C-alpha cells in the first residue's frame, strides 16, 4: 500500500433483541473501532454506529461519505456485528427501524472508486447469504456463518479479540492481517463449541485476494507508527530509502563494483541514522524496541 494511501472504517452493531446481545454487540463494535484506529492513524476515519444510530439512513450516509472520500489505492473496511436473517431470497441485517438488505449494501459498496480495496466482515447469523453476491475484484468478504445458520454468531467477538491480540499476530511483525484475524477467530469459534461440548452451529468463510497483506490492526510499537506524527513521517522516509536501496540493487549488474558500493554505502548509513532517530522517538514514548535499529513495521 502506498505511504499516502488512506484507510476508512465503518463499524455497525445491529439489534440484539435481548439486553445480553445488545451489550455484547456494542462492546464488540467498540473494541473493533478502537483497534481500527491503529491502522487509520486518525480516529476520525473510523465511524462507529451503535444503538439507535445504527439506522439504515445513517449506514447509507456513512458508506456514501466514505466512497466520496476514497481514491484508488485506498482501503475501506465495513464490519457488521449482530443478527442477520435470510428468507431464501434476501439477506437482511437487523437494525433499528427498517433493515438494510444485502442488495442495498452491495449497491453502496459498488459506489467506491475503482482501485479501492474493500474488506467486508459480516459477523452476523445467515451472513453466508450475502457473501457470494459481494464477491468481486478488490474486495475481501468474510462471512461468519453459512446462509442457513441462524443462531447468534460468536465470530464477531473473536474477530474483535484478534485485533487486540499478540497471539493473532502469527508472524510477529507487530501487525494483524485479515488472514491472521480470520484464522484466529475461526480457531477460537471452533474451540468454544468444543469447550461447550456443543455441535458447531456456525462455519465461517473468506473469499478474496491478498488477505495476508491487508492489515486490520497494529499492536504495541507498531500502533504508534500509525498514531504518532513523527513516527509516521519517519516511516515514510524509511520506505523511500528502501526504494532507493532496491533500485541500486537492481542496477548492480550494470555498475562497476566500486561504483556500486560507493553509491550504496551512504544510503545504508542514512537508513541506519534514521533507525536511530526512530529508536530515540520510541524511547521518548516509553516503548522499548528490542534493540532493532531498522524499526520497520
Please place each PLM-identified region on the residue numbering.
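Active-site-proximal C-terminal subdomain of hydrolase catalytic domains
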Residues: 30-33, 118-201
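Functional beta-strand-loop-alpha-helix junction segments that form "active/interaction loops"
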Residues: 31-74
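Glycine- and acidic-residue-enriched helix-capping/strand-helix junction motifs
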Residues: 18-32
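A short, glycine/acidic-enriched catalytic loop
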Residues: 58, 83-113
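Acidic/histidine-rich, surface-exposed loop or edge segments in extracytoplasmic proteins
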Residues: 7-19, 44-45, 221-228
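Caspase-like cysteine protease fold
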Residues: 169-246
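Active-site-proximal beta-strand/loop segments in catalytic clefts of secreted hydrolases
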Residues: 12-16, 49-53, 79-83, 95-98, ...
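Alpha-helical, heptad-rich or low-complexity scaffold/stalk segments
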Residues: 24, 123, 227-234, 240-286
Amino acid at each position: 500500500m502506498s505511504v499516502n494511501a488512506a484507510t476508512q472504517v465503518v463499524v455497525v452493531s445491529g439489534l440484539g433483541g435481548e439486553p445480553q446481545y445488545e451489550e455484547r454487540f456494542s462492546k464488540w463494535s467498540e473494541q473493533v473501532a478502537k483497534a481500527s484506529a491503529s491502522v487509520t492513524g486518525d480516529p476520525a476515519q473510523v465511524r462507529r454506529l451503535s444503538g439507535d444510530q445504527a439506522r439504515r439512513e445513517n449506514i447509507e450516509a456513512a458508506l456514501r461519505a466514505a466512497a466520496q472520500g476514497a481514491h484508488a489505492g485506498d482501503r475501506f473496511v465495513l464490519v457488521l456485528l449482530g443478527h442477520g436473517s435470510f428468507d431464501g431470497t434476501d439477506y437482511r441485517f437487523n437494525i433499528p427501524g427498517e433493515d438494510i438488505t444485502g442488495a442495498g449494501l452491495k449497491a453502496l459498496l459498488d459506489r467506491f472508486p475503482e482501485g479501492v480495496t474493500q474488506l467486508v466482515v459480516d459477523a452476523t447469523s445467515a451472513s453466508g447469504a450475502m457473501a457470494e453476491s459481494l464477491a468481486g475484484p478488490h474486495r475481501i468478504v468474510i462471512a461468519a456463518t453459512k446462509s442457513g445458520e441462524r443462531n447468534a454468531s460468536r465470530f464477531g467477538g473473536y474477530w474483535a479479540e484478534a485485533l487486540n491480540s499478540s497471539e493473532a499476530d502469527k508472524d510477529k511483525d507487530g501487525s494483524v492481517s485479515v488472514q491472521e484475524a480470520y484464522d484466529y477467530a475461526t480457531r477460537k469459534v471452533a474451540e468454544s463449541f468444543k469447550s461447550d461440548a456443543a455441535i458447531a452451529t456456525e462455519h465461517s468463510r473468506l473469499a478474496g485476494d491478498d488477505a495476508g497483506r491487508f492489515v486490520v490492526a497494529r499492536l504495541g510499537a507498531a500502533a504508534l507508527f500509525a498514531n504518532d506524527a513523527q513516527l509516521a513521517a519517519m516511516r515514510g522516509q524509511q520506505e523511500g530509502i528502501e526504494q532507493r536501496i532496491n533500485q541500486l540493487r537492481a542496477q548492480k549488474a550494470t555498475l562497476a563494483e566500486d561504483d556500486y558500493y560507493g553509491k550504496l554505502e551512504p544510503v545504508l548509513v542514512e537508513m541506519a541514522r534514521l533507525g536511530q532517530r526512530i529508536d530515540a522517538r520510541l524511547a521518548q514514548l516509553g516503548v522499548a524496541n528490542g534493540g532493532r535499529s531498522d524499526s520497520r513495521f
